[in-house]
Amino acid sequence: MSRGLGDVYKRQIIGDEAVPAHNTTPESIEIHQSFAKMVDAGCKAVVMEVSSQGLKLDRTAGIMFDIGVFTNLEPDHIGPNEHESFEDYLNCKAKLFKQCKVGIVNADDKHTKDILRGAICKVESYGIGDNADIKAENIELLHEPGKIGLTYDCTGLVNMKVELNLPGKFSVYNSLCAIAITRHFDVDEEALKETLKHVKVKGRIELVKVSDDFTLMIDYAHNAMALESILTTLKEYHPHRLVCLFGCGGNRSKERRYEMGEVSGKLADLTIITSDNPRFEEPEAIIEDIKTGIAKTTGKHVDITDRKEAIKYAIEHGEPGDIIVLAGKGHEDYQEIKGVKYPMDERVLIKEVLEELKGN
């Protein structure tokens, strides 16, 4: 089935063509122009990420979605350039369920009831708790060289054994969400199980082979909630050391810097603070804010402003059994400095570092 896609990677996929986009959720006229192109390309379904900003600015007004999905919510995107308060953020998210036919929601998230207040759609839920319509039971971790994953039993509206080559409770939730959605498309169970077993998403717990001794991965975790989630998950696999490398974006809330610093300081054995997208701020000033959060903990840290040098330090000092997380950039292939997006892909940086270390 031909499909269309609009997502956080700021791209649109129309049939087999990938088209760059400026926003996660484009302006309304662009959305409908894209829909028209998708119809012309023979697309039968569209999967679209609808951001809180997109809902706030009515970019999706007039669209009735067949399925709307709510995964989770924590304070984020709050500031002078985004939402004035968490209440505004939540209320904007909730607008989605006033313009969809079926709402699929995470039964375990503490904000689900508020998100569904005023909803006009039929509601189905997924989760780990007993009150979910589709739930995961008997979760078991899988860990062997070059592989971090888990298995669980899916029960309720869908019953099957699930295996994932991805770690963590959040991967359980993500897969349950996918199962809940695909139920409405009559997807073959064996095809679904095989897809879940091998699914990989660029920049999301993306394993990169650098050594036979330790594990390195790239992940888009760019706020405290996401960082805490992945670090807590990885600690369950009992690494020799958990090493976290990250920075924070410029011209965004300083609270995020303090919170991420504190989270990494508490959970990681070593934090390597570096640059992310400094935008119009000085990278060193952002690093100092992150260190303010780390100072609330007893966590060890080093700060290396240049991201490539920081990655080199992480690889060069990797110890047997370590898990190293490069957090924050994920799928991004640029670094934004003073209004200019310079090419920068962590996969390329890793390759360059390995070549340099090999040459030495």
Predicted feature locations:
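N-terminal phosphate/diphosphate-binding loop that engages ATP/GTP or pyrophosphate donors
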Residues: G6-N23
